[in-house]
């Protein structure tokens, strides 16, 4: 077996990050071109990443750096983006955001799981795909996977399904935005309540401007926060299904807690107090968008269509139909709840 020198691994790691940075910068230039500007830098970064991944390709040695961008830099960007928000505005949206997000999360969990089982998808893959659709995409899938004892291959398929669906609907939302009967605020609620990943919600909501983006993040982070109670319920359910002689005590310490939400709230508090000069805040927000664009590039590079060939399209169609039902419910609830 060939020995890999630590310096080579480090170089490959930073090369992977460098690829996402290059894509983010190119997307930043392209988004200033007429007709492409409606997509925005974040959506363009996803598209370029997908094109790069399926033409030039991505070396396995570079994947660790790309994963770092798509996960760690995403969270760093979200935290810094908290500087855009005022806590009083979040408080005003709080109850409505919670109810809207909670209702749609329940719809998505029940619908996607039921459809997947109807299409004869195994229980583990059905649970993971339902959680990915309902809560926060790949992050929810990876968090729930140990609770349901999912194999790596099963987790990978679920992540691939959500990545493809989320990216597809992000592009559709962006293209359809001018034709939707929503105010910018309503569009932000809709995007935050129905799209899969945090990255997808942020990318799609940029089409509606700052107001749409702000409320989209609030609604989406409300869904992310609900990962903890969902994980508790799934953990208890799985423990009850274990054979009596194999049962271990369920521990709250093993629960996946999205700590970055507290960083986001802390940055919002800093902005509310007015602790930082406006010039510094603007600089940090620009940095947030660069980090988010790099995360989008990583998301696009990680979309793997090959997984469907091995496991079939049943889970994809369950996710697709479930997402369409989620979108329909999200659309209707905007008016039923009188949001915006």
Swiss-Prot record:
A GO CC annotation given for this chain: plasma membrane
Membrane topology: Multi-pass membrane protein
Pfam families reported in the protein's UniProt record: Cons_hypoth698 (PF03601)
Keywords associated with the record: Cell membrane, Membrane, Transmembrane, Transmembrane helix
InterPro entries from the UniProt entry: UPF0324_pro
Membrane-spanning intervals of the chain: 12-31, 36-58, 94-116, 126-148, 155-177, 215-237, 257-276, 281-303, 315-337
Subcellular location: Cell membrane
Family note: Belongs to the UPF0324 family.
Name this protein carries in UniProt: UPF0324 membrane protein OB3406
Organism annotation: Oceanobacillus iheyensis (strain DSM 14371 / CIP 107618 / JCM 11309 / KCTC 3954 / HTE831)
């Amino acid at each position: 077996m060939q020995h890999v020198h630590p310096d080579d691994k480090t170089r490959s790691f930073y090369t992977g990050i460098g690829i996402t940075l290059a894509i983010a910068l190119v997307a930043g230039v392209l988004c200033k071109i007429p007709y492409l500007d409606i997509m925005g830098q974040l959506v363009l970064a996803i598209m370029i990443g997908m094109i790069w991944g399926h033409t030039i390709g991505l070396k396995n040695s570079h994947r660790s750096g790309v994963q770092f961008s798509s996960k760690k830099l995403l969270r760093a960007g979200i935290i810094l983006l908290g500087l855009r928000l005022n806590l009083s505005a979040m408080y005003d949206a709080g109850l409505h955001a919670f109810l809207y997000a909670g209702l749609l999360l329940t719809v998505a969990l029940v619908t996607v799981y039921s459809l997947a089982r109807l299409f004869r998808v195994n229980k583990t893959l059905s649970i993971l795909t339902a959680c990915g659709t309902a809560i926060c995409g790949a992050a929810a899938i990876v968090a729930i996977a140990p609770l349901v004892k999912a194999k790596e291959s099963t987790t990978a398929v679920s992540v691939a399904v959500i990545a493809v669906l989320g990216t597809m609907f992000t592009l559709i939302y962006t293209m359809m935005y001018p034709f939707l009967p929503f105010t910018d605020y309503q569009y932000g609620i809709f995007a935050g309540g129905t799209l899969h990943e945090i990255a997808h919600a942020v990318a799609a909501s940029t089409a509606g401007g700052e107001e749409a983006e702000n409320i989209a993040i609030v609604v989406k982070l409300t869904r992310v926060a609900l990962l903890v109670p969902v994980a508790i319920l799934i953990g208890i359910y799985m423990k009850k299904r274990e054979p009596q002689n194999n049962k271990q005590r369920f521990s709250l310490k093993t629960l996946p807690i999205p700590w970055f939400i507290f960083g986001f709230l802390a940055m919002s508090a800093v902005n509310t107090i007015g602790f930082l000069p406006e010039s510094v805040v603007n600089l940090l927000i620009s940095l947030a968008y660069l980090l988010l664009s790099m995360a989008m590039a990583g998301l696009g590079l990680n979309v793997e269509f090959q997984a469907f060939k091995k496991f079939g399209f049943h889970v994809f169609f369950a996710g697709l139909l479930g997402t369409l039902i989620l979108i329909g419910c999200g659309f209707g609830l905007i008016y039923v709840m009188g949001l915006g």
